[in-house]
Amino acid sequence: MIKLLFMGTPQFSATVLKGLLDNPAYEILGVVTQPDRAVGRKKDIKVTPVKQLALEHGISIYQPEKLSGSQELIEITGLGADGIITAAFGQFLPTLLLDSVSFAINVHASLLPKYRGGAPIHYAIMNGDKEAGVTIMEMIKEMDAGDVVAKASTPILETDNVGTLFEKLAIIGRDLLLDSLPAYLSGELKPIPQDHSQATFSPNISPEQEKLDWTMSNQEVFNHIRGMNPWPVAHTFLEGQRLKIYEAQLAEGEGLPGQVIVKTKKSLVIATGQGALSLIVVQPAGKPKMSIIDFLNGIGRKLEVGDIIGR
């Protein structure tokens, strides 16, 4: 049985971890995940999906704010793990930790060397890519730059958003890891170096990127909305108040960027730099997420054709 240390945080990571837990060839000695966070207005404490899964299986849990230089680092290097598996962990692994194991493998949600970094799924959708994928790669000190063990791809559908693609890639990543790891460990599968000249990056989404630019084409704004749903969520402004936009549909029509060009009891169409978008699901400031029909029956009632949002 191969003894592993697992490192990751979101549901993507938990899906990969569950695959390892269900496989009798592997024993998970411990998991390293982000600290619990206070979320929402009530500041409720929320544990990570990886921690929740570890709790259910009685696995030791380590939650350093920063792994390098921590007491937890000393503890996990002494666990006697054969190897490390990471998936959406979000921190560099200290040399001390890498040197303590025979192998360290990362499950990364892009087709490397494209989209190294923390938000590959967001950028794949926002950039209008036709496919996304997962790469199994060796861990080195440089971010997502290790040799490639295996890759798998899947089409990005017009109906996909970050949430749906996240779920698809988690399953692909889980299966790809379990399929390739035995051959990698036996030496049958030889890792291939990345072409570093082709590397692109996907840094974490900044607050500035969340704001919609109505001068873009309707396809670009549509992709941007999908690439921010369900987090961190794209927004525009209505009378100085933030209006989050979760879903929209491509529409025909012309007008000034951000201008209301159609308003009925059931629809609100906004012009973009080229074409238009029909808003489907929105969230006004201080309100819950709602359908465009509910919005037009409430705060949106005062909007008129010709008004411009986003200012």
Swiss-Prot record:
Matching PROSITE patterns, A to Z? Answer: GART (PS00373)
Q: Does the keyword Nucleotide-binding apply?
A: no
Keyword annotations of the record: Protein biosynthesis, Transferase
Please name the GO terms that the record assigns under molecular function: methionyl-tRNA formyltransferase activity
Which parts form a coiled-coil structure per UniProt?
none
Record bears the keyword Protein biosynthesis: yes
Reactions listed under catalytic activity: L-methionyl-tRNA(fMet) + (6R)-10-formyltetrahydrofolate = N-formyl-L-methionyl-tRNA(fMet) + (6S)-5,6,7,8-tetrahydrofolate + H(+)
Its EC number is: 2.1.2.9
> What cellular-component terms does GO give this entry?
cytosol
What the entry lists under Gene3D superfamilies is as follows: Formyl transferase, C-terminal domain, Formyl transferase, N-terminal domain
CDD domains assigned to the protein according to its UniProt record, in alphabetical order: FMT_core_Met-tRNA-FMT_N (cd08646), Met_tRNA_FMT_C (cd08704)
Q: Which family does it belong to?
A: Belongs to the Fmt family.
Concerning PANTHER family, the annotation shows: METHIONYL-TRNA FORMYLTRANSFERASE (PTHR11138), METHIONYL-TRNA FORMYLTRANSFERASE, MITOCHONDRIAL (PTHR11138:SF5)
Q: What is this protein called?
A: Methionyl-tRNA formyltransferase
Q: Which organism is it from?
A: Streptococcus pyogenes serotype M6 (strain ATCC BAA-946 / MGAS10394)
